[in-house]
């Protein structure tokens, strides 16, 4: 059957999210993957994360009394070129479509920070402590910014428009809410196979989007782009219906052991032994379970009690286990047990 080309490939049964000390950094771990798929998916997701997620950025600035970016401002320690470099690093979250105009006015002495900007609507400055410039005694500055939404990097020459007022300076815009993405691929075990891939993506955002959502958005973009290459109707649903009508065992065996509310120790032992479904568990004998590292008699009794409540026990034989397309069957029956 042609659908076996994709249905018999192993799919990740575990997605984990690991927070870092920096709240804008998140690691996403997916395993197991077919050998080679870690590199394929890691590279694709990294490129999409860096290039294709939409965000907000300042596209132009107008400083009162300044005609061009090579000027200096009396009483301001930084020249206009340095101020523009600082402006590029202001991180903004804005749900509404741009362009929007925002203003900052301040008198010296003191430091002009991103948090001094008067925002509009739902706009939020994500790094309010970021320094824009430093004012001496008696100095005064007024700047007006244009904020727009978009994706990727846009050079300053594309932020120009014909009826721009004199003194409006277009600047380079980096719309992406993603600062940095890295990935690594390691070997992982599934059953007796030792060379499946484990993919770890580490994402640093500017705070406009969290890492978990960013990965979901990137995966959705990739899914949408690849869908145009699928030139046939998906037979998966028909296949599942055909199999479920001929199911020869209790559908409760398709329930995952994670849902049994076992103690942490027992759950970790099952996880380390790659026991995913109840159908996997009940085929184990007591002696096999006791040979599992860190698995003792107390954990064994706990599992036996839980299975007994379901009318099951260890050491059962199921001739049709594991069924073909087990993940789809589990989803089909998840509301029935």
UniProtKB/Swiss-Prot annotation:
> Which is a GO BP term held by this UniProt record?
DNA-templated transcription
Q: Which UniProt keywords apply?
A: DNA-directed RNA polymerase, Nucleotidyltransferase, Transcription, Transferase
Which Gene3D superfamilies did the record assign?
5' to 3' exonuclease, C-terminal subdomain, DNA-directed RNA polymerase, insert domain, RNA polymerase, RBP11-like subunit
Q: Is Methyltransferase found in the keyword set?
A: no
Disulfide bonds, which pairs?
none
Q: Which residues form a coiled coil?
A: none
Q: Name one GO cellular component term.
A: cytoplasm
InterPro entries the record matches: DNA-dir_RNA_pol_insert, DNA-dir_RNA_pol_RpoA/D/Rpb3, DNA-dir_RpoA, RBP11-like, RNAP_asu_C, RNApol_insert_sf
User: Region (Alpha C-terminal domain (alpha-CTD)) spans which residues?
Assistant: 249-337
Q: Name one GO molecular function term.
A: DNA-directed RNA polymerase activity
Known catalytic reactions: RNA(n) + a ribonucleoside 5'-triphosphate = RNA(n+1) + diphosphate
- What are the boundaries of the region Alpha N-terminal domain (alpha-NTD)? 1-233
Query: What EC designation does it have?
Result: 2.7.7.6
In which domain of life is the source organism classified?
Bacteria
Which Pfam families would you find in this protein's record?
Answer: RNA_pol_A_bac, RNA_pol_A_CTD, RNA_pol_L
Q: Which family does it belong to?
A: Belongs to the RNA polymerase alpha chain family.
* Domain notes for this protein: The N-terminal domain is essential for RNAP assembly and basal transcription, whereas the C-terminal domain is involved in interaction with transcriptional regulators and with upstream promoter elements.
What this chain does, per the entry, is described as: DNA-dependent RNA polymerase catalyzes the transcription of DNA into RNA using the four ribonucleoside triphosphates as substrates.
Q: How does it assemble?
A: Homodimer. The RNAP catalytic core consists of 2 alpha, 1 beta, 1 beta' and 1 omega subunit. When a sigma factor is associated with the core the holoenzyme is formed, which can initiate transcription.
- Protein name listed in UniProt: DNA-directed RNA polymerase subunit alpha
Q: Which organism is it from?
A: Bartonella bacilliformis (strain ATCC 35685 / KC583 / Herrer 020/F12,63)
Highest classification ranks of the organism? Bacteria, Pseudomonadati, Pseudomonadota, Alphaproteobacteria, Hyphomicrobiales
